[in-house]
Regions:
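Catalytic Walker B motif of ABC-type/P-loop ATPase nucleotide-binding domains
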Residues: 166-169
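Conserved ABC transporter NBD signature motif
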Residues: 64-72
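A short, proline-enriched helix->beta-strand linker immediately N-terminal to the Walker B motif
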Residues: 160-164
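Helix-to-loop junction immediately C-terminal to a conserved catalytic motif
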Residues: 56
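ABC ATPase NBD coupling module
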Residues: 19, 73-90, 192
Length: 224
């Protein structure tokens, strides 16, 4: 199990400085295995995106642990955690996170700025753009891309450093059926290639691509 969360929970104060809290994620355990695609479905506000950001090492939990290859993420200093996250986790964030001033290829290459490797990343970036069907748009700007193309670009960016873990937050939101299927197929292919892939979505179509499915409701995670 390459990523494991135990006793993980998150509370938020209802008002600044207030004593009343809202439990976004109730204590839960979950693990991700290499070569498998896991899906968490649930309506907006169910806590699934909060859970994903904790698993990604971005949002500090109220309680519990997140371990990546045995290393407790939140026992690390911020710089150490960021370095581990950039090296081992590919994140497909919710919405359009492209930098409009950069080309599609340069957007895909952004992770290499944060975490360098010996081999030149440009060749890998172009290879991924071919894989996701965007080779002809490498020098285009994100404003020239459709919603489906932007999501495919985000997946290529997440896979650039060949991370063993891929976390995708609502990767098919706002896409038509054909584009949603294309995006989910790419994530399925990443799992087939050996990555541990997690998809959180308010849509149920992703379950058809999953090895394991969960639902989330009011911060509670339930195995399907």
């Amino acid at each position: 199990m390459i990523l494991e969360a135990t006793g993980l929970s998150k509370e938020f104060a209802r008002a600044r400085g207030g004593k009343r809290v809202f439990t976004a994620v109730h204590p839960l355990d979950i693990g991700l295995d290499e070569g498998q695609l896991t899906v968490i479905s649930g309506h907006s506000g169910s806590g699934k995106s909060t859970l994903l950001t904790m698993l990604a090492g971005i949002l500090t939990p109220t309680a519990g642990h997140v371990r990546v290859e045995g290393t407790d993420l939140y026992s690390l200093r911020d710089e150490e955690r960021s370095r581990l996250r950039n090296a081992r986790i590919g994140l497909v964030p919710q919405g359009n996170t492209a930098l409009r001033a950069l080309t599609v290829l340069d957007n895909v290459l952004l992770p290499s700025v944060l975490y360098s490797r010996d081999e030149a990343p440009a060749a890998r970036g172009r290879e991924l753009l071919t894989t996701v069907g965007l080779a002809d748009l490498a020098e285009a700007k994100p404003t020239e891309l459709s919603g489906g193309e932007l999501r495919r670009m985000a997946i290529a960016r997440a896979l650039l450093m060949e991370p063993p873990i891929v976390l995708a937050d609502e990767p098919t939101a706002g896409l038509d059926s054909a584009n949603a299927t294309a995006v989910l197929t790419l994530l399925r292919d990443a799992a087939n290639a050996g990555a541990a892939v997690l998809v959180v979505s308010h849509e149920t179509e992703a379950r058809h691509f999953a090895d394991r499915s969960y639902t989330m409701e009011d911060g509670h995670l339930r195995d399907q």
